[in-house]
Amino acid sequence: MEADVIKLLAAGLAMGLGAIGPGIGVGILGFGALQAIGRNPEAKGSIFTNMILLVAFAESIAIFALVISIVLIFVA
């Protein structure tokens, strides 16, 4: 295989595998937040605020994977 093909394959794997974890995590987080709101509707504001903050933290992992894949394509 040529070096360019290997670089593109590595970048694709880095982004694909780096996005699986945050995707699953955000799904579980949303499920838990909706269950909590269903049990205690008065706490909706607090639960929603915490959920948005944690979703941002989870998605930062996917952004790091994107940066790594871009570095693999253009720098390595």
Swiss-Prot record:
F(1)F(0) ATP synthase produces ATP from ADP in the presence of a proton or sodium gradient. F-type ATPases consist of two structural domains, F(1) containing the extramembraneous catalytic core and F(0) containing the membrane proton channel, linked together by a central stalk and a peripheral stalk. During catalysis, ATP synthesis in the catalytic domain of F(1) is coupled via a rotary mechanism of the central stalk subunits to proton translocation. Key component of the F(0) channel; it plays a direct role in translocation across the membrane. A homomeric c-ring of between 10-14 subunits forms the central stalk rotor element with the F(1) delta and epsilon subunits. The keyword Phosphoprotein does not apply. The chain crosses the membrane at residues 8-28, 55-75. It comes from the Bacteria. Signal peptide: none annotated. This is ATP synthase subunit c. InterPro entries: ATP_synth_csu_bac/chlpt, ATP_synth_F0_csu, ATP_synth_F0_csu_DDCD_BS, ATP_synth_F0_csu_sf, ATPase_proteolipid_c-like_dom, F/V-ATP_Csub_sf. Its main location: membrane. GO terms for cellular component: plasma membrane; proton-transporting ATP synthase complex; proton-transporting two-sector ATPase complex, proton-transporting domain. GO terms for molecular function: lipid binding; proton-transporting ATP synthase activity, rotational mechanism. It is a multi-pass membrane protein. It comes from Dehalococcoides mccartyi (strain ATCC BAA-2100 / JCM 16839 / KCTC 5957 / BAV1). Belongs to the ATPase C chain family. The keyword Ion transport applies. F-type ATPases have 2 components, F(1) - the catalytic core - and F(0) - the membrane proton channel. F(1) has five subunits: alpha(3), beta(3), gamma(1), delta(1), epsilon(1). F(0) has three main subunits: a(1), b(2) and c(10-14). The alpha and beta chains form an alternating ring which encloses part of the gamma chain. F(1) is attached to F(0) by a central stalk formed by the gamma and epsilon chains, while a peripheral stalk is formed by the delta and b chains.
